[in-house]
From Swiss-Prot:
Cellular component terms (Gene Ontology): periplasmic space
Signal peptide: 1-20
Family designation: Belongs to the TolB family.
Name this polypeptide is given: Protein TolB homolog
Organism: Chlamydia abortus (strain DSM 27085 / S26/3) (Chlamydophila abortus)
Main location: periplasm
InterPro entries: 6-blade_b-propeller_TolB-like, PD40
Disulphide-bonded residues: none
Pfam families reported for this sequence: PD40
Gene responsible for this protein: tolB
Length: 427
């Protein structure tokens, strides 16, 4: 809806779209940012409202800048002269966003109503920024997603004894618990389907690890499989309605597939698609169309990445990376063009990316701290991962565009297994 409104507005300026074609960004490329001037117009004399609106405007500007394609800056009213100018106009509690090209007249493009819920207001600002980002660049904004992760505050003997799942915004805001199970909950994975933003995770609350279904609206997860043994590392394909996971139901940690839907749950019996002849398997991740899986196997002695075609017919797995011999945690990008993963390089686990088009891989991080669990934002150009040594771990954002990292400041405790998702479907 917003994009149609913007196109109509641009037609008045004699411009169809400044960035109609998606910006193709390679792993090590730089792009010039589009300057954006932002004006804040407050129609209230209430000091507390003015302060609050200024904080929301700061959030909005940071949101626009997050994707590394726009260069927004706050300017005084009437001094805008950038290629595009945005006004954030407040008649409390309503906020209207208007857009103008150069010195042309502003056109309204989005509006929202503030509530008494500060977290909800922040989310509304995130969503407004992402919609405007998409309209200007044809690339999804990434500020409105949620990062879910496992937070432990009682690490002992170099092992996580207990950890609950939490969610947080990219900037550390809106931090809140998702589970209250007094157990160890790990490896959350967004399902990217449904309005309730469901996710899968593994919990030890029954003593051994089992796969559960959770959502942002419910703090109690539901066990989804009735299979003996341990189950780990769930991944879901919304296109194929398939759940991939690892289980030792037959003795060896093997890769399984299970038909699954939110309405019907598990459908039929799970299929073991690889057995012990392919070593110990782990970390499955679907391609966006659900036709392939990337996973880890140690069949050659060390953990390495393999790709398995599962549709239209099952083929034998093929080795993905030959450069690195100790790899784990693969994550397929939403655009289907890249796979992020971890590899031990000079004794340290680093974040790398494999380009499926060129067959080349790149090392993205170099600091002497172990990293794990890369997870993509919806734009396929930004990652979240955890990094730390024994007894400590923090979350970091990584831009493939700028090659820069940024720590998400949350507080005490070990933060592991991040998953970035929950993005609105209407960008």
């Amino acid at each position: 809806m917003l994009r149609r409104m913007l196109v109509s507005a641009f037609l008045m300026f004699g411009i169809i779209s400044l960035y109609a074609k998606e910006l193709e960004v390679s792993v090590r490329s730089e792009i010039s940012r589009l300057p954006i001037h932002v004006e804040l117009k407050i129609g209230s004399n209430d000091a507390s409202q003015q302060k609050y609106l200024r904080s929301l405007c700061t959030t909005f500007i940071n949101d626009l800048a997050l994707g590394d394609r726009l260069q927004p800056s706050l300017v005084q009213t009437g001094s805008s002269s950038a290629p595009f100018n945005i006004a954030m106009v407040s008649h409390y509690p309503e906020i209207t966003f208007t857009l103008a090209r150069g010195t042309q007249n502003h056109q309204p493009v989005h509006s929202l109503m503030l509530t008494e819920d500060n977290a909800l207001n922040r989310q509304k600002i995130h969503e407004a920024a992402d919609k405007i980002h998409y309209a200007l660049t044809s690339v999804p904004g990434i500020s409105s997603g949620k990062i879910i992760f496992s937070l432990s505050k009682n690490s002992q003997d170099c092992e996580l004894k207990q950890g609950e799942l939490w969610s947080v915004d990219y900037d550390g805001g809106n931090l809140r618990p998702l589970t209250q199970e007094n157990s160890l909950s790990i490896t959350p994975s967004w399902m990217h389907i449904g309005s309730k933003k469901p996710y899968l995770y593994v919990s030890y609350k029954f003593g051994i690890p089992k796969i559960f279904l959770g959502s942002l609206e419910n703090t109690t997860g539901k066990k989804i499989l009735h299979l003996q043994g341990n189950q780990f590392m769930p991944a879901f394909s919304p296109r194929k309605k398939l759940l991939a996971f690892i289980s030792d139901a037959y003795g060896n940690p093997d890769l399984f597939l299970q038909s699954f839907s939110l309405s019907q749950g598990a459908m039929g019996k799970p299929r073991r698609i690889l057995n012990e002849t392919f070593g110990t398997q782990g970390n499955p991740s679907f391609s966006p169309d659900g036709s392939k899986l990337v996973f880890v196997s140690n069949k050659d002695g060390r953990p390495r990445l393999y790709i398995l075609q599962i549709d239209p017919e099952m083929l034998s797995p093929r080795l993905l990376t030959k450069k690195y011999r100790n790899s784990s945690c693969p994550s397929w990008s939403p655009d289907g063009k890249k796979i992020a993963f971890c590899s031990v390089i000079k004794g340290v686990r680093q974040i790398c990316v494999y380009d499926l088009a060129t067959g080349k891989d790149y090392q993205l991080t170099t600091t002497p701290v172990d990293k794990e669990g890369p997870s993509w934002a919806v734009d396929s150009q930004h990652l979240v991962y955890s990094a730390g040594n024994t007894g400590e771990s923090e979350l970091y954002l990584l831009s493939l565009i700028t090659q820069k990292t940024k720590k998400i400041v949350i507080g005490l405790g070990e933060k592991r297994f991040p998953s970035w998702g929950g993005f609105p479907d209407n960008q």
